[in-house]
């Protein structure tokens, strides 16, 4: 059976090309094909009337195909020999990109996109995708002082998360990279640290047996989960956090993931969790 693909959404911006680089490297690690997607959809205020102008639509179509071509070329530079295909999607950009994650191992988008009417995939759309896609979503941010790709994998641990999909994803990622894993629980209030330590011990005991080669350590930290994990992102190769609730069950992604996406200095994985 063929491996499920890694999917990346693009819009022609440099930020999108950096997301392509991240996705291509991840697909190579996972021995998976890479699928690059963009959306040919015109914002309502710019849709031509029955009389025209069709030139605007043609320009948008050309921009979309150019974005795909540039992305395929960049993926080939980063991971020569990687099986790559490109698809031009239709429909509402946010929903189309989120839906492209169906059957994928993960879906990658950039934190920001282009300005103007061709900004179809990234920026605000990335938050919609992170809260609605049926698979893990990685939002790639490349700041000037972004952490090295060979850093630790950090995962935020909530209470009763021993079987969490987010923890499973983090351990798998650490194993693929040969990286250390840091399990973090943010706490506050009297007795919070002791309770946090208990949660982390319970969580790691199960996953250490499944991934004995992964060096994992617990860290209980006082503070808001989103801000605590954002601080860790300064040195992490990837920060992983769970998204609770069914895909499409509302536009709110949750306080901690929302805060983390707004303040992280490196890539963030948002993993849908059933529990």
Question: Can you annotate each of these PLM segments?
Answer:
Residues 1-2, 15, 55-58, 73-107, ...:
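Structural beta-alpha unit
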Residues 1-54, 151-195, 201-219, 238, ...:
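Small/aliphatic-rich secondary-structure junction motif
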Residues 31-33, 82, 135, 179-180, ...:
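Short glycine/serine/threonine/alanine-rich loop segments
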Residues 44-46, 96, 147, 191, ...:
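Generic structural signal for helix capping and beta-alpha/helix-loop junctions
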Residues 54-66:
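A short acidic, glycine-rich active-site loop
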Residues 64, 68, 72, 197-200, ...:
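N-terminal membrane-insertion helices
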Residues 99-144:
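Hydrophobic alpha-helical segments and helix pairs
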Residues 109-128, 150, 218, 238-263:
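Glycine-rich, Arg-bearing micro-motifs that act as flexible, cationic patches
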């Amino acid at each position: 059976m063929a491996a499920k693909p890694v999917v990346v959404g693009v819009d022609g911006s440099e930020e999108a090309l950096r997301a392509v680089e991240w996705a291509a490297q991840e697909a190579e690690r996972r021995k998976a094909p890479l699928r690059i997607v963009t959306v040919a959809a015109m914002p309502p205020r710019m849709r031509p009337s029955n009389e025209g102008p069709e030139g605007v639509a043609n320009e948008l179509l050309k921009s979309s195909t150019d974005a795909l071509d540039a992305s395929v070329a960049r993926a080939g530079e980063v991971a020569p020999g990687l099986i790559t295909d490109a698809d031009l999607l239709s429909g509402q950009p946010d929903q189309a990109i989120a839906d492209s994650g169906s059957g994928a191992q993960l879906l990658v988008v950039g934190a920001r996109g282009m300005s103007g009417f061709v900004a179809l995939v990234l920026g605000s759309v990335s938050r919609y995708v992170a809260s609605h896609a049926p698979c893990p979503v990685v939002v790639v941010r490349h700041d000037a002082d972004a952490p090295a790709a060979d850093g630790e994998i950090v995962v935020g641990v909530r209470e009763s998360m021993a079987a969490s999909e987010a923890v499973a994803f983090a351990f798998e990622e650490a194993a693929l990279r040969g990286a250390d894993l840091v399990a973090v629980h943010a706490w506050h209030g009297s007795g919070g640290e002791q309770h946090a330590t208990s949660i982390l011990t319970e969580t790691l005991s199960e996953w250490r047996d499944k991934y004995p080669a992964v060096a994992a350590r617990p860290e209980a930290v006082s503070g808001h989960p989103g801000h605590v994990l954002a601080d860790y992102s300064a040195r992490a190769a990837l920060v992983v956090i769970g998204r609770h609730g069914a895909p499409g069950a509302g536009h709110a992604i949750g306080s901690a993931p929302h805060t983390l996406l707004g303040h992280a200095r490196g890539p963030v994985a948002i993993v849908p969790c059933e529990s």
